[in-house]
Amino acid sequence: MLSKKLTVDKIPHMIKNKRVLVRVDFNVPIKDGKVADPTRIVSTLDTINFLKENGAKSIVLMSHLGRPKGVRQEQFSLAPVVPALEDIIGQKVNFLNDCIGTEVEGEVANTKDGNILLLENLRFYLEEEGKGVINGEKVKADPTKVESFRSQLTRLGDLYVNDAFGTCHRAHSSMVGVNVDTRAAGFLLKKELDYFSKVLEDPKRPLTVILGGAKVADKIQLINNLLDLADEMIIGGGMAFTFNKVLNNTPIGASLYDEEGAKTVHGIMEKAKEKGVKIHIPSDFVCAESFAEDAKFAYKLKMKESQDGWLGLDIGDKTIRSFDEVIRRSNTLFWNGPSGVFEWKNFAKGSHAMLQAVTESTKNGTVSVCGGGDTLNLLKQVDGAKENISHVSTGGGASLELVEGKELPGIKALSDIN
């Protein structure tokens, strides 16, 4: 249960004079030796400030950057993060040139009260991920060395805080191997847990799930798990053509068709019927002569009228109105995937209309949670859209696995609330 995990706001009385080891996600883009986008650093500020305000003896930050695959490579050093981190928190940060070892332990033990330290990239060691590449060969870490690595990390803190949701689906040493008594979620991770529990554990009804994406096969676990939870489900994106062809035997021209996923469509519909979930698929589309931004296109072209060679790239006006009604009668929304090729202006209308319906519903009290890279890119196209969604997940693969019903190792490793 996500809502039963210990969060840092529950333990202010335990922080004073303690060394707090914090797993953050500073996997930020570096350009010309500087941080190009500090968003992930900024997102940890609430947790760092809370630990400072409650008298932590020291705050030891650990992270990965890039994919060095178990070998020290200076291009993946966390050193360039330090100036950006200092600007954001308004305090000097001591950067350590390693993440384990006697020198690191000595620095942490002897640091002045109130200091913040940043360890070097965890993934310079095979033992963090448990595998890597050495001299072009894939290798697995020695289990004995993994245990030693985890023990050395554990010696750096009295308390452990995890604020790296995006890595919670990985059973990496820094996520599951810090063996201290108190292991709490930071504020960034807490927000993810709070909002996903509102979708997965205690949603305000009706709960509507909006799914896009190219292939049914890629979303089958997600769909199956959400059918146990949802009241209504909207199927958009490339998946819609597979559903239409299988269920209605409609010609789809050159539109995307997922042969593997097609085998699962009837099973999905049977489960939906059994669970009482209404599934909505598009009834009209915007089609193009070819898959190109400047292709000749036609509005409101029903698929049964679609010429061979044409392909659907967005939903049509009738579908927009239908989906709009479903969204606006919902009290909880989970959105993963746009309805069309929104990157191209001629095929963005459907996705933008759905975004408008979601944001306006949110303003009226609906709880809305969005996740997935394409959905986030859509939000970036519209000024102020992100601020009008209840929660935009930073998790990527972690949020996807959570909604698929999987237990995330990084969350499982947190202490339970007593």
UniProtKB/Swiss-Prot annotation:
User: Could you state one GO biological process linked to this protein?
Assistant: glycolytic process
Residues reported to bind Mg(2+): A214, A217, D218, D374
Pathway(s) = Carbohydrate degradation; glycolysis; pyruvate from D-glyceraldehyde 3-phosphate: step 2/5
Q: Which residues bind CDP?
A: G213, D218, G237, G337, F342
Per UniProt, (2R)-3-phosphoglycerate binds at: V24, D25, F26, N27, R40, S63, H64, G66, R67, L122, R123, H169, R170
Cofactor(s) needed, names only, are:
Mg(2+)
Catalysed reactions, as listed in the record: (2R)-3-phosphoglycerate + ATP = (2R)-3-phospho-glyceroyl phosphate + ADP
Sites where the protein binds AMP: A214, K215, K219, G238, G312, E343
Binding-site list for ATP: A214, K219, G238, G312, E343, D374, T375
What is any one of the record's Gene Ontology cellular component terms? cytosol
Q: Which keywords label this protein?
A: ATP-binding, Glycolysis, Kinase, Magnesium, Metal-binding, Nucleotide-binding, Transferase
Q: What is its EC number?
A: 2.7.2.3
Assembly, per entry: Monomer.
Alphabetical list of PANTHER family matching this protein: PHOSPHOGLYCERATE KINASE
Family, similarity comment: Belongs to the phosphoglycerate kinase family.
HAMAP family (alphabetical): Phosphoglyc_kinase
The protein in question is named Phosphoglycerate kinase
